[in-house]
Amino acid sequence: MKTKAEHSIIADAIHEWHTVYLPCIRNLSHNALKSYGEGMGIYIDFLESSKGVTSNTICGECFRKDWIEEWIAWLKEVRKCSPQTCNHRLSILKNFLRFLAHKKIQFIKYDCDAAEIKRMQQPKKQAEVITKDTIKRIFASIN
């Protein structure tokens, strides 16, 4: 029995994930689907530009933990993405890897490895403080 090439399995999984799983099972909105597609496309662009991987050579090893961590650094340094954007892109890739591992057990290692990658720290936003003087002016304007 002839087994399907890894690049074909991954390409089919990306297609099913984006056209069936996300819109029908997860019921994501059009904008969310667009974001997920862009996120996956950015990872594939990274593989092509930084690792020399093509659509015919993509394989499970392309989802190694160290490559994903390099990608996160690349997003931050080269693309100038904020920590929030980097975390969103990482969650998209993790979502795909979980889907891929459920479809083909041979990819479960990459799902487990990706799950260990920590999110970037995001700066906490300072709460805006309303001064007593401002509150007095607000109440004074009501009268």
Label every PLM stretch briefly.
Residues 2-4, 15-31, 37-125, 141:
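N-terminal core-binding DNA-recognition domain of tyrosine recombinases/integrases
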Residues 7-13:
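A detector for short, charged/polar N-terminal pre-domain segments
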Residues 137-143:
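Basic, Lys/Arg- and aromatic-enriched nucleic-acid-binding interface segment
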Residues 129:
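Catalytic-site neighborhood detector that most strongly recognizes the C-terminal catalytic loop/helix
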